[in-house]
Amino acid sequence: MLGKKAYKVIGMILAMMLVAGCGAAADETAEPELLLGFSQIGSESAWRIGNTHDIERAAEDYGVSLMFENANQSQENQIDAIRRFIAYKVDVIAFSPIVEDGWDNVLMEAKEAGIPVILVDRDIKTDIEGLTTCLIGADFYNEGVMAAEYLIRKADELGLESVNIVEITGTENSTPMRQRQAGFADTIAGDERMHILESIDGDFLKSRGAECMRYLLDTYGDEIDVVFSHNDEMTLGALPEIENSGFVPGKDIIIISIDAGQEAIDVLKEGRINCVVECTPNLGDELMETALKLKNGEEVEAVIHPVEQAFTDEMDVDSIEPRGY
């Protein structure tokens, strides 16, 4: 039999092993695998809020430490945030640029610091190679194409010989504004029935969507056959203005939107919107996976686009599943 001294020795050894094990576990959790600095444009829409929530959720799922900055619609705030990330020596920087131009200086600072940069949702314009490593986001050009393709089918269905369109665009010089506009315009260019009466900047805001629609109705009235709006928030702002002017959206005026948030899908089901092109905000998993690859020195794809679709009055709209944003 073991004596009391032997039991004490064994107990001490077991206790030391337990402490050592706990210490190792603490060490493993103390240092996250990745420190990611992310600058978000703002919280101007349900889409943007959903995008933020998905990135925060993914960071937690992947064990990534997230430094989050809300720019509140200001490029200056975003540039300041990126400089803070550089000073803090994060492993990777990611941001959704509010506009395409004006990033060269701060991104050169990140490059000189050896910090890779990922673009999320939107692209930038630059003549300097190597400032960013990857773009994760929707194919905005194709969203414009899908919107135009629906309109052409709808015009065929209704037998329209002439189609007058007003366009409420997103923030001027932003990637989605430019590419959605280009995709739409290029697709209808070969159809002589299609005429864009005016394009006006709605800044992706519900309030601006209402203001733009009031102006367009005052200017063109019953000449308007179609409203093509670059996001759901502006569309939802425009609808009451259309109704207050005595028109029935979805019937008197064809309504085409982009984002496919839950509120817009509900209005599609009511028949007040005809087409909503999807632009998913759920980019968190792709962002975390890409950032981890960069931290580990792995190659990443230059562009990552999620698969998207259009929801239209041509389909069984009641079968559309909850959107989550």
Model-found features: residue ranges?
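Short, solvent-exposed amphipathic alpha-helices that sit
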Residues: 47-62, 143-150, 175-194, 208, ...
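Hydrophobic alpha-helical segments within soluble ligand-binding/sensing domains
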Residues: 36, 78, 135-162, 208-210, ...
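Hinge/cleft segment of the Venus flytrap/periplasmic-binding protein
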Residues: 32-34, 168-172, 176, 187-188, ...
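Short, low-complexity disordered leader/linker segments with a strong preference
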Residues: 1-35, 60-61, 65, 108-115, ...
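Extracytoplasmic "Venus flytrap"
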Residues: 35-58, 62, 66-80, 84, ...
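Hydrophobic alpha-helical
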Residues: 92-112, 184, 198, 202-266
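Short beta-strand elements at the ligand-binding edges of bilobed clamshell
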Residues: 68-70, 126-153, 167, 199, ...
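Flexible loop/hinge segments that line or gate small-molecule binding clefts
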Residues: 105-142, 261-269, 315
